[in-house]
Amino acid sequence: MKITSTSCICPVLVCLCFVQRCYGTAHHSSIKVMRNQTKHIEGETEVHHRPKRGWVWNQFFVLEEHMGPDPQYVGKLHSNSDKGDGSVKYILTGEGAGTIFIIDDTTGDIHSTKSLDREQKTHYVLHAQAIDRRTNKPLEPESEFIIKVQDINDNAPKFTDGPYIVTVPEMSDMGTSVLQVTATDADDPTYGNSARVVYSILQGQPYFSVDPKTGVIRTALHNMDREAREHYSVVIQAKDMAGQVGGLSGSTTVNITLTDVNDNPPRFPQKHYQLYVPESAQVGSAVGKIKANDADTGSNADMTYSIINGDGMGIFSISTDKETREGILSLKKPLNYEKKKSYTLNIEGANTHLDFRFSHLGPFKDATMLKIIVGDVDEPPLFSMPSYLMEVYENAKIGTVVGTVLAQDPDSTNSLVRYFINYNVEDDRFFNIDANTGTIRTTKVLDREETPWYNITVTASEIDNPDLLSHVTVGIRVLDVNDNPPELAREYDIIVCENSKPGQVIHTISATDKDDFANGPRFNFFLDERLPVNPNFTLKDNEDNTASILTRRRRFSRTVQDVYYLPIMISDGGIPSLSSSSTLTIRVCACERDGRVRTCHAEAFLSSAGLSTGALIAILLCVLILLAIVVLFITLRRSKKEPLIISEEDVRENVVTYDDEGGGEEDTEAFDITALRNPSAAEELKYRRDIRPEVKLTPRHQTSSTLESIDVQEFIKQRLAEADLDPSVPPYDSLQTYAYEGQRSEAGSISSLDSATTQSDQDYHYLGDWGPEFKKLAELYGEIESERTT
């Protein structure tokens, strides 16, 4: 099979030569070579030869972007087996077969049905095969060929980036590289000049230029000044076909900004300035601003201000505001119009960051003169000191002078000044001030231990202008006097072991004093000399504001005495010296041999009784509850009793029932059996409560040993003898007073009752001697007796 290619038409001569070569090759390839085959037929061996392929193939070319109405002819497939009778069928497979490329299966002509773009796909690989139309058997093996898309100049150059934004320092040398731009062309760079790009500048001359081959942009002028022009817009063109007429082109914009360098010194707008400052301006406050201009920007415009000379250098100072680049003039010392009315300052502003490449442009600093006018202001009174410190002793009398403050009018008028205290807190009311002289006095008695320090605020005002006020703080320290005696530092729980030895230290005590250190230490500890010498304990002053308690004798017994009391004296070193007395309580405890406490008297009692602390508390609570019940019961019983004496208006003939059994309290207490069991409890004599005894016996004093040794019989005899000789104990006779009926009683008279006694048995004259209570009874019975007599 042979392939003809009539599509190679550009240039024509080359295509004709190429077609002639193709046909020559096909002619020489028409020789068929048979493939060797071995076949056994009836014992004979038949040799077959494989014929040589009858294909002739090559590359086909097709123009891109074909816009004709008919399919574009690509080429022709032909096989040597094709006799022109239509028995050979051509089949085309591969990339684009049947869609982009179609084949006439009889003639082998190939056509392109679509417009192709080389930039999308440069070539197509296809497969061709010739088969027998009747049997569909291949006449020759399948062959592969390529269809290449022929390039045309249909793509303009394109810049990879853009628009571009770049910077270049101002005052740069001519030819300084700014940026390199690059444009690409999608056409085939190996075919003609379709992809050969040339650069040119359309806008931006004469400031910048571009290299036509590399696309490098450079400065075209020397010393371009940012302050004159800062921004430039440069348009660069890229054109293919080596820039020839008819070539395609693309463009981009490059925005170039000149960056600043320090090529301009600072300049003050004026050479002379004038500033007004009132004399009342506060020290440290800003009184004015000044600024020098710099055409540069950023750090190149940074500057510092300084005072280089002038008569106000010690009065004023200047600093630089880094944000606004202004010089801030501040006051270092107070102004006084009466002393100086104006000042002159020379102020300099200089760049901070210098560029030595431009030092030839001159010094990068400037100076100006500032005149300051001091304004007269009516000022408030001025105290002689910014604050005052005074001292006064505690317990000083009311009206004691503490100190004096002084304020004057600083103006030339020298107005009179008045003083007063701002009573903002309660502490200020301990003092007052003389409005004319400024003398501060006490109004209360001060106590250093309660308040050691006072702070008061004194205000001064002018009489002519009361609105002008000045304030000053007065600190008053209260000095200490020795008015507090020393006392024990705390309550001490001191114990002594039963097995203690003489001279043994059992405890160490210390003292405190509310007074100041100068009037407090040192403390002296001693025993009161007015008391007898304590035989059990002594006191030793350690001369370090402590004292030790020592034993005087050997061994102590809890059964004999379990608690001892030791009175001590403590004095301080103040002038005059003060002292106080205290009593130490010392308990006797049982200790181990190594000195550890085992039990004390309270613990021993509980342990011997077999009771714990919780059990003891429970017993006490039960006893208290029982006592409360008994008291409540007795109170209710007593509230139900009638009064012993009934008033005259409330006498009735009623039968009164008494529920008391036995004797009274005197009878029950006189024969209390506890007196026999504990004779010492009977030492106190019992007296009747309804009368006052006429004679009292002196109490008896007997030793406990005598009472313990006497027996019960002797004790009873002794008490019986005392009762017989004592007129103040029962039995004894006394006059008892009872209620009487009275004249207005609603009850009937008892005279209606007949007496069972005879006349000789009763004598009623004695009733008149019993008093007014029996007067009515005497009258009744006296009349009856007289009637009987008559």
From Swiss-Prot:
Propeptide: 25-53
Glycosylation sites: N36, N255, N455, N536
Annotated positions of the Phosphoserine modification: S786
Molecular function per GO: beta-catenin binding; cadherin binding; calcium ion binding
GO cellular component: adherens junction; catenin complex; plasma membrane
Ranges of residues in domain Cadherin: 54-159, 160-268, 269-383, 384-486, 487-608
Main location: membrane
Subcellular location, record wording: Cell membrane
InterPro entries for the chain: Cadherin, Cadherin-like_dom, Cadherin-like_sf, Cadherin_CS, Cadherin_Y-type_LIR, Catenin-bd_sf
Signal peptide positions on this chain: 1-24
Record topological domains on the Extracellular side: 54-608
Superkingdom in the source lineage: Eukaryota
Alphabetical GO biological process terms: adherens junction organization; calcium-dependent cell-cell adhesion via plasma membrane cell adhesion molecules; cell migration; cell morphogenesis; cell-cell adhesion mediated by cadherin; cell-cell junction assembly; homophilic cell adhesion via plasma membrane adhesion molecules
Keywords: Calcium, Cell adhesion, Cell membrane, Cleavage on pair of basic residues, Glycoprotein, Membrane, Metal-binding, Phosphoprotein, Repeat, Signal, Transmembrane, Transmembrane helix
Membrane-side (Cytoplasmic) residue stretches: 637-790
Membrane topology: Single-pass type I membrane protein
One Pfam family, short name: Cadherin
Transmembrane segments: 609-636
Free-text comment about domains: Three calcium ions are usually bound at the interface of each cadherin domain and rigidify the connections, imparting a strong curvature to the full-length ectodomain.
Function in brief: Cadherins are calcium-dependent cell adhesion proteins. They preferentially interact with themselves in a homophilic manner in connecting cells; cadherins may thus contribute to the sorting of heterogeneous cell types.
Protein name per UniProt: Cadherin-18
Gene: CDH18
